[in-house]
Amino acid sequence: MIPYANSPLSVPAQSARTLLVVSGAITLALYLLPFGGFLARPFVLLSTLVHELGHGLTSLLLGGGFRRLQMWSDGAGVADLDTTGFGRLRGALTLAGGLVGPAVAAALFFTLGRTAPGARACLLGLGVLLLLCEVLVVRNLFGWAFTGLVAAACLLTALRGTPAASQLAVVFVAVQLALSVFSRADYLFTRVASNPNGRFPSDVEVMAQLLWLPYWFWGLVCGAFSIAVLGWGVRIFWGR
């Protein structure tokens, strides 16, 4: 006999699972309401911001630079990086860092969102990171305004909100970033990307040029990695 095998869930686990259900219900409501797409638009923009930060932070981790970040209201974004001296592998990893960025961020948010203290630390860390980005790398008006608003919301919720509010915010954002992995998956299988500055080879197309195999192969690799990371994050969140 193993007494703990069928024991009730701990209070933190019950709370976390309830928050996940609530976040899912809110998300469903956003998609069902006539104006839900408008209300959900900020989360599309958030996935863009996380994508571009994924490129920039990966470049920094691999010894490169992060010069500038721009994003626009249509959901497009670009990160200007210094990859001088990067070989093919480091260049490809920097590109992949943006493609898997939303999934990695979602998994991290799920992990920290299991507890109220973890959620508060997550919001504080994200708020400070975004403020640093605001000063150091964001270089267009829309990007500056959006990044500043997200940073302010994170810090305000962490410092003034209740523990439950912080936890709900982190879990809700994790759900939105997780959904963006699937709702924006078409970008993993396109050769051309566009923004107000023009049309350019997509991330997977440049990866193909660096590593020879076709762009769709690298789209599959990044997609599979994203799903695996998400699964890991949800499993930890669910208490397994």
What kind of feature is each model-predicted range?
Residues 2-29, 74-238:
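Metalloprotease/metallohydrolase-associated module, dominated by Zn2+-dependent proteases
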Residues 10-56:
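N-terminal signal-anchor transmembrane alpha helix
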Residues 36-91:
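Small-residue-rich helix-interface/hinge motifs
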Residues 64-68, 111, 239:
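Residues in and immediately flanking transmembrane alpha helices
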